C-alpha cells in the first residue's frame, strides 16, 4: 500500500489509505529492532533500502506526549536506562556493526575532532577540556556498555497508555554507562536526590562514583553545547555554557 508522507527533516509522518499512521525515518540506527524487543524504543514495522542507498524504516505511530524536564525524575526512566545499559545483545550488535569502546581519553579526542571550529577556539571550553585531560577517571572495558548519548527530555515519549520510550538513537556509542547517568543527574535531578537515584540504579554512593559523575557531567555539557551549536540553537548553547559554569563552580570545589 502506498503512503502519503509529511517530511520533518529526515523524519516523516506516513499514512496509509486506511488512515493508519506510521513514523518514518531515514538512515536510522540498525539496532532499532533490538531496542524494540527490549521495549526501549517503539516497535519497528519494516525497513527498506532506497535506490539512492539510504535506508528507510517505519515505526508504530505513538499518540502521547514528550516528557518535560519535571517528568525526568521517574523511576520508570531509571528502569529503562538500566535495561539498556545491561543489555549484552545490544552491546554485541553494536560491536558487530563496527563500534569500538571509547575510553574517557577517546571521548575527549572525539569532541576535539567533531566540535565546530568556533567551539574549539572558545577559551572557557578549552579550559574545561584541559581540566578533563588532567583528571581522566578510571575505565574498565568490562564495565563499558551501550549508551544512548543524548538523553534530553525531548527524546523521551510517553504514550497515552503510560508506556515510556526513548527515541533518536543517532548518538549511540559504547563507553562507560556514566556517560548517560551523569547527563541525567546534572540536567534533571536535584542534588538532594542523587543518592537515592544512584543507589536505585545500582551504583554505590561514594567519592569514586561522585568524581566520575563530576567528570562525565562536564562532558555531557560539552556534548550538548556541540549539538545545539550544530543546530544553530544559540540560546540553548549559551544556557548550556552557563549551566556548565555553575556545575563546575559548585562541585569542583568539593573534590
Residue positions per predicted region:
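Helix-rich C-terminal or lid/interface subdomains of diverse kinases
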Residues: 186-188, 200-255
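Conserved catalytic-loop position in the HRD/HxD motif
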Residues: 145, 150, 155, 168
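A conserved alpha-helical element in kinase catalytic cores
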Residues: 9, 16-87, 188
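Active-site Asp-x-Gly
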Residues: 159-209
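Short, small-residue-biased leader/transition segments that mark boundaries at the very start
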Residues: 3-8
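Active-site beta-strand-loop-beta-strand hairpin of nuclease catalytic cores
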Residues: 15-22, 158-164
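An alpha-helical support segment within catalytic cores of ATP-dependent transferases
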Residues: 1, 89-149, 254
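A glycine-centered beta->alpha junction motif in the catalytic cores
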Residues: 50-70, 105-116, 219-234
Amino acid at each position: 500500500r502506498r503512503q502519503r508522507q509529511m517530511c520533518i527533516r529526515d523524519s516523516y509522518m506516513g499514512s496509509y489509505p486506511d488512515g493508519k499512521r506510521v513514523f518514518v525515518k531515514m538512515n536510522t540506527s540498525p539496532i532499532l529492532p533490538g531496542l524494540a524487543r527490549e521495549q526501549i524504543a517503539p516497535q519497528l514495522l519494516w525497513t527498506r533500502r532506497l535506490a539512492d542507498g539510504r535506508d528507510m524504516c517505519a515505526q508504530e505511530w505513538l499518540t502521547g506526549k514528550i516528557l518535560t524536564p519535571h517528568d525526568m525524575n521517574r523511576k520508570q526512566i531509571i528502569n529503562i536506562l538500566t535495561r539498556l545499559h545491561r543489555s549484552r545483545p545490544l552491546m554485541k550488535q553494536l560491536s558487530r556493526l563496527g563500534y569500538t569502546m571509547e575510553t574517557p581519553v577517546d571521548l575527549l579526542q572525539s569532541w576535539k575532532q567533531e566540535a565546530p571550529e568556533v567551539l574549539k577556539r572558545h577559551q572557557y571550553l578549552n579550559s574545561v577540556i584541559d581540566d578533563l585531560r588532567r583528571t581522566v577517571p578510571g575505565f574498565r572495558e568490562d564495565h563499558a556498555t551501550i549508551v544512548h548519548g543524548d538523553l534530553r527530555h525531548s527524546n523521551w515519549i510517553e504514550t497515552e497508555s503510560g508506556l515510556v520510550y526513548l527515541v533518536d538513537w543517532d548518538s549511540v556509542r559504547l563507553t562507560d554507562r556514566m556517560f548517560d547517568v551523569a547527563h541525567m543527574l546534572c540536567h534533571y535531578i536535584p542534588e538532594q536526590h542523587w543518592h537515592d537515584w544512584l543507589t536505585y540504579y545500582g551504583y554505590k554512593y561514594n567519592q569514586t562514583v561522585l568524581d566520575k559523575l563530576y567528570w562525565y557531567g562536564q562532558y555531557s555539557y560539552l556534548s550538548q553545547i556541540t549539538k545545539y551549536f550544530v543546530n544553530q540553537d544559540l540560546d540553548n548553547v549559551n544556557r548550556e555554557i552557563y549551566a556548565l559554569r555553575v556545575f563546575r563552580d559548585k562541585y569542583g570545589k568539593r573534590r
